[in-house]
Swiss-Prot record:
Gene Ontology cellular-component terms listed: nucleus
Lineage, uppermost ranks: Eukaryota, Metazoa, Chordata, Craniata, Vertebrata
Keyword DNA repair: no
InterPro entries assigned to the protein according to its UniProt record, in alphabetical order: Galactose-bd-like_sf
Protein name: Nuclear receptor 2C2-associated protein
Annotated localization: Nucleus
UniProt keyword annotations, A-Z: Nucleus
Family the entry assigns: Belongs to the NR2C2AP family.
Organism listed in the record: Xenopus tropicalis
Gene3D superfamilies linked to this entry: Galactose-binding domain-like
Function description: May act as a repressor of nr2c2-mediated transactivation by suppressing the binding between nr2c2 and its response element in target genes.
Statement: the UniProt record of this protein carries the keyword Lyase: no
Length: 136
């Protein structure tokens, strides 16, 4: 059975926050489990979320919930060990919907994981993400 590898000591970073308003749209809302909060990127191509784990973790699934109209057609998942360079694990292709989407890939051991949103469905390149979880 797979379980979340995210914890209170997981460090996260994002490419941008809409209007730099971290109180309303910051990265902390990706992981809070509340339906009414979200991370909202600013405009621009190739938005991303990076997670750093305190030790190596095994990952095999990612769960995402976008706001329809502000999702992504192609995502790249990359990972590495502590000081290594990120290498591609998988590409996946979310639908432009509000529902929770689950993607499975070959199990990998990583200490850093980056999800890159390569082409947003929004004309300005914004991403709105209500939920992100990584399981292994």
């Amino acid at each position: 059975m797979v379980t979340s590898v995210l914890s209170s000591v997981t460090i996260s970073r994002v490419s941008s926050v809409l209007n730099r308003d971290v109180k309303q749209f910051g990265k902390q809302f990706l992981f809070d489990g509340r339906e009414e909060t979200c991370w909202n990127s600013d405009q621009g191509s190739c938005q991303w979320v990076l997670m750093e784990f305190p030790q190596n973790v095994l990952v095999s699934q990612i769960h995402l919930q976008f706001q329809g109209g502000f999702s992504c057609q192609t995502c790249a998942l990359e990972g590495c060990y502590k000081d290594g360079e990120l290498v591609k694990i998988a590409d996946f292709y979310p639908e432009d919907t509000n529902t929770l989407q689950k993607f499975t890939f070959a199990e990998q051991s990583v200490s850093k994981l980056r999800v890159s949103f390569l082409n947003s469905t929004d004309f300005f390149g914004r991403i709105t993400l209500y939920h992100l979880d990584v399981l292994g």
